């Protein structure tokens, strides 16, 4: 009985010291002791104050781990998402007032949509002194529009290609040229001696315009393909083309190559 009492007394007097490791902090069960005499403890933690300190350190470590994992960008408050743009107002909703009838008449006469009519009016304001020309090929598959003066300065190139196809043209910046329709109907041909992309309609074969290879920002438009009513005068200026001898040699080589590929060989040539 003396040993049992001594062991109970030793267990009752035993307390956790701050330097004890967590593994050594076991539950302290005191037989016959009241709650006022025995402090509140937890298994594996020790006293209540030590448990609070340990829990605070654990929470701080967990928070810093999340901070390092998230990065600085994720910690910043996200900007509020902008409101989606509302639907664009239809032409009927525009407050045109007494000009609505003129607007509809202008749009129907030119066969333009509301956006196209607005573009024409804005271009007229941005290009003062220029005229809005429209044109196309013979069958109507290719249609284009161009802003140019009413008095056209037409270039007559003397190269063999331009002489054969009679391509007189006036030059305009690419920003003033708009292909309205027929992109799928255009066939492009490029000569070895002429730095230009000659575009033809695949149905009727008419060339309405061409683009320069050296400067794609410039278009050459055929004046005879423009619609009537917008051209006031035409001044033709002849310019020199490439070297006639070089062009003739290249043309002869192209003709010989094409004829040799398409024409069958003579029986005598096959025997030799």
Swiss-Prot record:
Bias type Pro residues, positions: 79-90
SUPFAM superfamilies attached to this UniProt entry: Mss4-like (SSF51316)
Cofactor binding notes: Binds 2 Zn(2+) ions per subunit.
Family matches, as Gene3D superfamilies: 2.170.150.70
InterPro entries: CENP-V-like, CENP-V/GFA, Mss4-like_sf
Family: Belongs to the Gfa family.
Protein name: Centromere protein V-like protein 1
Naturally occurring in which organism (per UniProt): Homo sapiens (Human)
Lineage, uppermost ranks: Eukaryota, Metazoa, Chordata, Craniata, Vertebrata
């Amino acid at each position: 009985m003396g040993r049992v009492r001594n062991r109970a007394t030793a267990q009752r007097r035993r307390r956790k010291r701050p330097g004890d490791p967590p593994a050594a902090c076991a539950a302290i069960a005191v037989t016959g002791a009241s709650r006022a005499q025995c402090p509140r403890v937890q298994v594996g933690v020790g006293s209540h104050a030590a448990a609070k300190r340990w829990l605070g350190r654990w929470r701080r470590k967990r928070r810093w781990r999340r901070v390092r994992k998230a990065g600085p960008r994720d910690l910043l408050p996200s900007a509020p998402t902008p409101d989606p743009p509302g639907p664009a107002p239809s032409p009927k909703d525009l407050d045109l007032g007494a000009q609505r009838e003129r607007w509809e008449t202008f749009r129907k006469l030119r066969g333009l949509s509301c956006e196209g009519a607005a573009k024409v009016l804005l271009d007229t304001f941005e290009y003062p002194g220029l005229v809005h020309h429209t044109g196309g090929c013979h069958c109507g598959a290719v249609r284009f529009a161009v802003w140019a003066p009413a008095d056209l300065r037409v270039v007559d190139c003397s190269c063999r290609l331009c002489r054969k196809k009679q391509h007189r043209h006036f030059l305009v910046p690419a920003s003033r040229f708009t292909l309205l329709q027929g992109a799928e109907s255009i066939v492009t041909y490029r000569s070895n001696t002429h730095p230009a992309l000659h575009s033809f309609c695949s149905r009727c074969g008419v060339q309405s315009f061409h683009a320069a290879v050296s400067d794609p920002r410039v278009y050459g438009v055929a004046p005879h393909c423009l619609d009537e009513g917008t051209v006031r005068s035409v001044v033709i200026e002849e310019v020199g083309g490439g070297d006639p001898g070089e062009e003739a040699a290249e043309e002869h080589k192209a003709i010989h190559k094409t004829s040799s590929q398409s024409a069958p060989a003579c029986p005598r040539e096959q025997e030799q």
